[in-house]
Amino acid sequence: MSSDRACMLCGIVQTTNEFTRDGCPNCQGIFEEASVSAIECTSPSFEGLVGMCKPTKSWVAKWISVEQYVPGMYAIKVDGRLPVEVVDLLPHYKPRDGSQVD
């Protein structure tokens, strides 16, 4: 059984232990402001993986909206819903579960 999870906000994939110990390297400040834990904002259900070495120089990073994030493995689609406390802080939030169509 895999212990990998993906952040529902940025899509980075890490182990459950990494999220528990360190939080999300991209979104932890938002989670703290919303008074929620990183685990509440992650999902074990995700699809597709993209490795980002240089997100600022990658067209794929731009396509999946991770160009401003740290290098790492990112999920293309993440199932689940962020806590309302987080969504309320983000006026331009786009879910990573594919439910919002541009």
Swiss-Prot record:
SMART domains: Spt4 (SM01389). One of its GO terms (cellular component) is mating-type region heterochromatin. GO terms for molecular function: protein-containing complex binding; rDNA binding; RNA polymerase II complex binding; single-stranded RNA binding; zinc ion binding. The keyword Nucleus applies. Belongs to the SPT4 family. Keywords: Centromere, Chromosome, Metal-binding, mRNA processing, Nucleus, Transcription, Zinc, Zinc-finger. InterPro entries: RPABC4/Spt4, Spt4, Spt4/RpoE2_Znf, Spt4_sf. The keyword Ubl conjugation does not apply. A zinc finger (C4-type) spans 7-27. This is Transcription elongation factor SPT4. Component of the SPT4-SPT5 complex. Interacts with RNA polymerase II. One of its GO terms (biological process) is regulation of transcription-coupled nucleotide-excision repair. Gene3D superfamilies: 3.30.40.210. It is found in: Nucleus; Chromosome, Centromere. The SPT4-SPT5 complex mediates both activation and inhibition of transcription elongation, and plays a role in pre-mRNA processing. This complex seems to be important for the stability of the RNA polymerase II elongation machinery on the chromatin template but not for the inherent ability of this machinery to translocate down the gene.
